[in-house]
């Protein structure tokens, strides 16, 4: 997958041995990319991400920035979210979550990356 380099690969191997053994929701929560709600009183609909494995999330953030440029599938996903006036950080977090769930599925199913043809 474009955007996944040696730094991300080694980080995932070392700090996320559960990759490929969990569901997409579980792996997103484990990394800290699942939004949690803190609704109370007037604060409704505000979601944030927190917790999880910070070193994995930090490296995944930089990989997502690279993938938004060079991975055609994620580039289209990024532009689609930007067209709906999402905030830039929200878009990057969505790309991060898509990357980790895709990598999780690839390891679970033991398949190589196959870019979608246009």
What are these regions (language model features)?
Residues 83-118:
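Basic, amphipathic alpha-helical segments enriched in Lys/Arg and hydrophobic/aromatic residues
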Residues 6-84, 88, 115:
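Phosphate-backbone recognition surface of nucleic-acid-processing proteins
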Residues 4-7, 59, 93-95, 100:
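Hydrophobic aliphatic residue packing
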Residues 1:
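Histidine-centered phosphotransfer motif of kinases
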